């Protein structure tokens, strides 16, 4: 299974590279991602709609094929109404991805392909306003970044048209099976690869947009725990939605058909990627709500909190928020009294918003819920305001566990992060559980990743809360207080590498030898400089 997964992922990546090569030199890689991702989305919508119509109509007419119909088909209005009610959108037969590509391959008149695509995307979005219009917000602006008139695609209309043809025909050749039938999330892997590839070129953090699937799976399994079903899942910095979608893979599609997905994302392009990802995974438009706004400084999050399935908060909170970014903090007076932050005794430092995200997650967490948050290591031990917030979290018994992750898990950073696990329903006597997963990885290309075996070991240990030498330990809160509220895993769990005690005498002797050698080298350097000076003084510049 693991070999098949790798082969499929490599196949998707190879095809994406081929597309990138075809457009290389004409458009910036970071901008190009929108063309491929929206092209994939367009293909998915078309195939998804055809499957919906064909499955329904072939019960009475085995030869029915929606893609072979004409736009003036006698029952087209009835089909349109059915699609709007069930899918939230509609595409005319002539506007289907496969029919547009067919026209390109048959070398029909495609000089106006740019306007054709623009009209198609406009019509799809307008169709979401029909019926009760509930799907409008889920589709609004999704095609905005597919600019068919972008001069970077080519200096003339003819060149741009050829590039668009190449793009669509290449996307058509991608072997992307349905999500539930594939041993990998093919569309998700395409997203992950594209975003990380272009993020590196643009100097952006891949973690800003897509959390790798192995880390996403670990976070989701930690937050879900031993539950068979959940009502809702929330990600306060959802990026392209990879973490939210892991709930489906962990629990299975049968048990997640009624799950509500909530997310918030500050970057508009990434916000669009997330909504597309929800739709690509057959999440009903009524079951996801993604907001484009600043999580920390606006009140938009309240819309989620009010509408979540549980009156007292979300059942599952998973997130990989940006590390140590600056935020308004105490420069914005209303944040001091904000219900999410006021009980902690201080706001997170203006230059490091990490714990502001943690406090936000805690506030929206339900009484029976679990939050699993990827954190920058510094927030676990730094003094000042961050220590004050850790004190609040520990004293109020909200910290359930801290899990150290291996370094180099993300494609654009080698930082060794940790997972902070929060709960509100802990017993007063419950200790905090620490797991050192720093050695739980396999090497793949230039990065580390968590194998299924690595994930299983960490999850099993977390669920059982069973101590294991050099791997996991339960620590009483009093001991953490004595350690100045330091939550670093290495403070309480000793790895194999740290077991060997240092011989102080040998260490001091080595230091003395280094110091003596340093003195000797300095003396030799001084002698060399002096010799050079003497030689220079003896030079007769008049000869």
Swiss-Prot record:
Keywords for this protein: DNA-binding, Methyltransferase, Restriction system, S-adenosyl-L-methionine, Transferase
GO aspect biological process, one term: DNA restriction-modification system
UniProt binding sites for S-adenosyl-L-methionine: 208-213, 240-242, 265
GO molecular function: DNA binding; N-methyltransferase activity; site-specific DNA-methyltransferase (adenine-specific) activity
EC number: 2.1.1.72
InterPro entries recorded: D12N6_MeTrfase_N, DNA_Adenine_Mtase, DNA_methylase_A-5, DNA_methylase_N6_adenine_CS, Restrct_endonuc_T1M, SAM-dependent_MTases_sf, T1MK-like_N_sf
Tree of life domain: Bacteria
Induction and repression of expression: Detected at low levels after 6 and 96 hours growth, there are fewer copies at 96 hours (at protein level).
One Pfam family it belongs to: N6_Mtase
Catalysed reactions, semicolon-separated: a 2'-deoxyadenosine in DNA + S-adenosyl-L-methionine = an N(6)-methyl-2'-deoxyadenosine in DNA + S-adenosyl-L-homocysteine + H(+)
UniProt key word Endoplasmic reticulum: no
Alphabetized PANTHER family for the sequence: SITE-SPECIFIC DNA-METHYLTRANSFERASE (ADENINE-SPECIFIC), SLR6095 PROTEIN
Family: Belongs to the N(4)/N(6)-methyltransferase family.
Quaternary assembly: The methyltransferase is composed of M and S polypeptides.
Annotated function: The subtype gamma methyltransferase (M) subunit of a type I restriction enzyme. As the bacterial DNA is methylated on this sequence and this is the only type I methylase in the genome, it is probably responsible for all of the methylation on this site in the genome. The R subunit has multiple frameshifts and is probably not expressed in this bacteria.
Name of the molecule in the record: Type I restriction enzyme MpnII methylase subunit
Species for this entry: Mycoplasma pneumoniae (strain ATCC 29342 / M129 / Subtype 1) (Mycoplasmoides pneumoniae)
Organism taxonomic ancestry: Bacteria, Bacillati, Mycoplasmatota, Mycoplasmoidales, Mycoplasmoidaceae
């Amino acid at each position: 299974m693991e070999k098949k997964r790798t082969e499929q992922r490599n196949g998707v990546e190879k095809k994406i590279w081929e597309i990138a090569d075809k457009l290389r030199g004409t458009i910036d890689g970071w901008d190009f991602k929108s063309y491929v991702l929206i092209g994939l989305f367009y293909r998915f919508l078309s195939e998804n709609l055809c499957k919906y119509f064909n499955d329904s109509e072939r019960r009475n007419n085995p030869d029915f094929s929606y893609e072979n119909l004409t736009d003036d088909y006698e029952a087209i209005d009835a089909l349109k109404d059915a699609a709007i009610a069930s899918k939230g959108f509609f595409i005319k037969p002539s506007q289907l991805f496969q029919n547009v590509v067919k026209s390109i391959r048959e070398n029909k008149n495609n000089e106006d392909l740019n306007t054709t695509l623009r009209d198609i995307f406009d019509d799809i979005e307008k169709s979401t306003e029909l019926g009760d219009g509930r799907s409008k917000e889920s589709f609004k602006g999704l095609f905005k970044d597919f600019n068919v008139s972008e001069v970077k695609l080519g200096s003339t209309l003819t060149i741009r048209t050829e590039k668009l043809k190449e793009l669509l025909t290449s996307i058509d050749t991608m072997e992307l099976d349905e999500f539930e039938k594939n041993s990998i999330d093919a569309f998700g892997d395409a997203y992950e690869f594209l975003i990380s590839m272009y993020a590196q070129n643009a100097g952006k953090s891949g973690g800003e947009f897509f959390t790798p699937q192995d880390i996403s799976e670990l976070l989701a399994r930690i937050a879900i725990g031993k539950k068979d079903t959940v009502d809702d899942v929330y990600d306060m910095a959802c990026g392209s939605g990879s973490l939210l979608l892991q709930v489906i893979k962990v629990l299975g599609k049968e048990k997640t058909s009624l799950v509500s997905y909530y997310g918030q994302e500050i970057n508009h392009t990434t916000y669009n990627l997330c909504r597309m990802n929800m739709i690509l995974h057959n999440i009903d438009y009524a079951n996801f709500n993604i907001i484009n706004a600043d999580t920390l400084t606006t009140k938009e999050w309240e819309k989620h909190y009010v509408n979540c399935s549980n009156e007292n908060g979300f059942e599952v909170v998973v997130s990989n928020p940006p590390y140590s970014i600056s935020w308004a903090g105490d420069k914005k007076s209303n944040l001091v009294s904000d219900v999410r932050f006021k009980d902690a005794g201080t706001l997170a430092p203006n230059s490091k918003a990490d714990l502001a995200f943690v406090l936000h997650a805690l506030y929206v967490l339900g009484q029976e819920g679990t939050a699993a948050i990827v954190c920058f290591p510094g927030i676990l031990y730094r003094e000042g305001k961050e220590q004050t917030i850790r004190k609040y979290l520990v004293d109020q018994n909200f910290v359930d566990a801290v899990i150290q992750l291996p370094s180099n898990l993300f494609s654009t950073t080698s930082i060794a992060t940790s997972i902070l696990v929060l709960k509100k329903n802990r017993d007063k006597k419950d200790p905090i559980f620490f797991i050192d997963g720093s050695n739980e990885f396999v090497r793949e290309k230039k990065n580390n990743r968590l194998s299924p075996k690595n994930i299983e070991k960490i999850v099993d240990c977390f669920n059982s809360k069973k101590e294991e030498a050099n791997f996991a330990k339960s620590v009483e809160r009093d001991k953490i207080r004595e350690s100045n509220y330091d939550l670093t895993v290495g403070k309480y769990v000793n790895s194999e590498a740290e077991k060997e005690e240092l011989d102080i005498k040998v260490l001091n002797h080595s230091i003395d030898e280094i110091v003596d050698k340093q003195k000797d080298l300095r003396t030799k350097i001084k002698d060399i400089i002096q010799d050079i000076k003497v030689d220079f003084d003896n030079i007769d510049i008049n000869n």
